[in-house]
């Protein structure tokens, strides 16, 4: 929960996406939904795709490099004088030695950067 009205949180989501060059795919203020287009990153830096035989896949000394693709989905809901913010992410990885996509998770730090930016903007004194 964020101790700010819906409109302040909504504007914070829009401003955060703009400042971080996150392209918007869906923008529906009536339902409180914002979804990004797919962003390109790096396995190991932006997404965790697990390990193979105990060796991390990609990044930070991993044996396999690769591309990561991820999205943000944000739901903003009014709860009286406060606003609920739900942030969900999807992430997949690709590597030339693997058939199909790897199922990955977005790096917690990357998700927290977006969440805290929205929260800090919404609660900043005006």
Task: Locate predicted features.
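Ser/Thr-rich, low-complexity intrinsically disordered terminal regions
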Residues: 1-126
């Amino acid at each position: 929960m964020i101790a700010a009205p819906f409109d302040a949180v909504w504007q914070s989501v829009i401003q955060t996406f703009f400042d971080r060059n996150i392209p918007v795919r869906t923008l529906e203020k009536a339902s409180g939904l914002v979804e990004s287009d797919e962003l390109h990153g790096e396995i190991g830096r932006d997404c965790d795709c697990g390990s193979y035989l105990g060796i991390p896949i990609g990044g930070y000394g991993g044996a396999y490099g690769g591309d990561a693709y991820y999205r943000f989905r944000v739901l903003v809901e009014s709860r009286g004088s406060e606003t609920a913010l739900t942030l969900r992410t999807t992430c997949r990885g690709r590597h030339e030695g693997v058939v199909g996509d790897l199922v990955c998770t977005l790096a917690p730090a990357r998700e927290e950067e977006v969440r805290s930016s929205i929260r800090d903007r919404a609660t900043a004194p005006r």
